[in-house]
């Protein structure tokens, strides 16, 4: 059974504790788990940025802010595990070795952040390489990779397809401080390039987009892979 790693943005899973999409994602992930082995890396989203903002206002440095962000990603991961119930391994994986060990149970493996100064997108890329994943999916708050931030620039154009090299060129200037909200960090981009693992960037605000991409082979977003290949099922 092929392995798929999903980088699930905290802002799409848990926009706030009062308004979250956990139940919707639980339904879709359970359906998908019958077709492939799933690893989910959960981001911190707005909750992490709020904690980081308060920590900075209190004089905390970037290292402390990073640690706070990682804690929040793991709390979000714990919420997803609670929703998945028996479909998920009951513990949050805290490193790549644990993720591989937990996968032996045949259940969905969920983790959050691991390393300070790295986004959960970078964690998901390294995880995909570690487990030999066939596909990496970034479910985020926009429907693909754009020429500029579509939330700020009405003229931004979505890239339907990119090579790993082109992706790296786009993200070279991404911010790397704690809580940064960019399409991918440069670590993720470099791992994607060296591993050759294809990447889909899609709109995670609708969890069904995961099912459409993985099961039906339909991705309205950006496909990152070498020219002449396609990661989508036919």
Curated annotation (Swiss-Prot):
GO terms for molecular function: ATP binding; UMP kinase activity. ATP binds at residues 10-11, 45, 49, 140, 146, 149. Its EC number is 2.7.4.22. It catalyses: UMP + ATP = UDP + ADP. Pathway: Pyrimidine metabolism; CTP biosynthesis via de novo pathway; UDP from UMP (UMPK route): step 1/1. Inhibited by UTP. Homohexamer. PANTHER family: URIDYLATE KINASE, URIDYLATE KINASE PUMPKIN, CHLOROPLASTIC. This is Uridylate kinase. It comes from Methanoculleus marisnigri (strain ATCC 35101 / DSM 1498 / JR1).
